[in-house]
Amino acid sequence: MEMQQNCSISCFWETQPLGCVKISCIFYHSKPRNINGLFLPPSSNTTLQKESQEGSPPPTQSQEPLKPMENVSRPIHHPLVLKTNFEEEEEEEEKPNDASSLWTKTPEEIEEKRAIKEMCYKSGEYYRFHAPPDIPSSKSIAPTVEKELEKPLENGSELQEGDGLTVPTKFSLFERAGEAKTSLDRKPRTDIAAFENGGGDCYAPQRIIFLGVDESEALAEDKETTSKGSNAKEESKNGLHPKHPLTARLVPTTHVLNATENISMKCRENPSSMNDVQPVRKPHFKGVKKRKWIYDEPKNFPGSGMRRAVHIPNPKHKMSYHHHNKNRNAENASYTHAQRDAVRTVTLNAPPRSRPTSGSYNKADVNKDPKLNLCPDKHMSTSYNGSAWRRRIPFSKTYSKTEKIYPEPRRNGSK
C-alpha cells in the first residue's frame, strides 16, 4: 500500500537540470529518462499497480541486481581513464618539460650546451655520447680523430727505440727493409740484454775491432809471442808471478769467441763481407761446444793450480797427457802426486802472454782456440780419478762433468 502512495509522489530529482539518474527510482516520473544509453519512458499508474498486485518480492528482486549496476555504470562525474602503457606517459611527460626548458633558457645557455656536446663527442667513445644530427661540425671532426688514432698503430711509431722484443703489426715490404737497415746502423742494443740472452753475442764494438785487423800484422805478432816461449822458464824462475800469463790469456779467449759469433752475424747482414770472414767460420763451429766451460772458467775457479794447464799450446805436453792417461789406473796414489808436480812444471813452460792491443783480436787466435778447448777433455781424466780420490779422502763429494775439472786438484794440489 505504501508503494502505491509513493508512486503517486513525483520524483524530486526530476526538477533538477540533470534529471533523475536512478534506474530503480520508485517515484513518479512524468518525463522520459536516458541513463547511460538506457531509455526509460515516463512511469504510468497501471504498471505500478500490476507490480504492487503481484507482491512485494518481485520489486525487491529487481532492485537487488540493479544496485551493483548503479555503482558501476552511473557516471555522476567525468570518467577517469587509466593508462597501462607507461612508455607513452614518459614521452608525454618529457615533451612538456622540453617545451618549458626551451622557453626558460636564453640563447647563450643553448649555445653553451651545444658547445659542451661537441666537446664530449670529440673526447672519444669513452663517454658513449652521440651528437644530434643538427651539428655538422662534429661530423667533420669525428673521421679526422679516428684517422689520427689509427696512424700510430699502422706506422709502429708508438714503439720505443731500442726495444727489440716488440714488433709492429702492420708493415709494407719497403718499410720492413728500411727498418732492418736502420736497426743495424744504430748503436747496439743494451749490453745487459745481450748478457741475458747468452753472453754478449751482439756486442758491436768487438765486431768492429775484429774486422779492422790485417792478416799479416796478426801473423807477425803471433810469431813474436811464440819466440818468447823459450824464455818463459827463466823468467818464471827469476820470480815472475805465475798469474800474469794466465790473466792475460783468459780475457782474449772470451773476446775471440764473441768476435767469431759477431762475424757470423755480420755475414748474414752483409753478404759482401763473406770473403774476409770465410776462413774464420770453420773453427768457430768447433769451439762452440766448449763455450760454456770457457765462460765459467774465470768466475768459478780463481785458483792458479790446474787452470794454467788449460792454455798450454805445446803439443809435446799433450802427448805426455795421453801417456799418463793410458797408465793411470795401473799406478798408485804416489804416482798421482808425481803427476801433479809434472803439471806444475808444464805450466811454467807456457809462454807469457800480455794482453794484446785492439788489433790483436785476429784470425790466428781464432784458429788456436779450438785446439785449446780440446785440452780440458784430455786433462780431465788425468786430473781426477774417482776411486783414487775416494780412497785418499773418504768425505769427498761427487761432482758433475763441469765441476770435475777443477775443485779437487785446487783443494789438494799443494803438499
From Swiss-Prot:
Matching Pfam families: DUF5571 (PF17732), zf-CCCH_3 (PF15663)
BP term (GO), one: poly(A)+ mRNA export from nucleus
UniProt biased composition (Basic and acidic residues): 220-238, 365-380, 400-415
Source organism superkingdom: Eukaryota
InterPro entries in the record: DUF5571, Znf-CCCH_3
Chain segments carrying region Disordered: 39-77, 220-247, 346-415
PANTHER family: RIKEN CDNA 1700017N19 GENE, ZN-FINGER, C-X8-C-X5-C-X3-H TYPE-CONTAINING
Protein name: Uncharacterized protein C12orf50 homolog
Taxonomic placement: Eukaryota, Metazoa, Chordata, Craniata, Vertebrata
